[in-house]
Amino acid sequence: FPAVSAGWRISDEPFMQGTKSWLTDLKLRADYGVTGNQGFGSYKSLATMTGFGYYMYNGKSYQVWGPARNENVFLHWEKGKNWNIGLDWALFNGNLYGSFNYYNRTQQDLVGDYPAPMPPYLFSSTFENVGTMRNSGFEFDITWNAVKTKDFSYTLNIVGATMSNKFVHFSKRE
């Protein structure tokens, strides 16, 4: 699955030289990537056979075989398309630092075990790709090294996040 990222250390630019006394670091970063999630065990999409006990015929015992599950040849991996943009910063020789990040993730072809009509299916449920979900939010963290001596240090850290989850699409294949 492909991915790409880039960063720009703004604090190293010539136009930022006048800020070196208080601005230790400033970096803008962004990334985009696609991830895969199989989300189901091997052979869930295939017609497999399983034993259904034994059948006596003419004094002999025969193993009975039949389908183990509903077949779904259209079942495929979930795909997550993710992008982030963030800002990392540090002030006063790194004594106050943090980051801000906005993210957006769209998970397509969600996999789940869903009810199936009988007939035409042999079993009451089947694995299907049925929907799309979008997650987005904002994350931040700020750290302050309040006291830093040879024998003692005291650090304050604040973290926070928001998150929004939304089903964009939910439908079964007809």
Feature-to-residue mapping (PLM):
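Extracellular/periplasmic, surface-exposed regions of secreted and cell-surface proteins
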Residues: 1-174
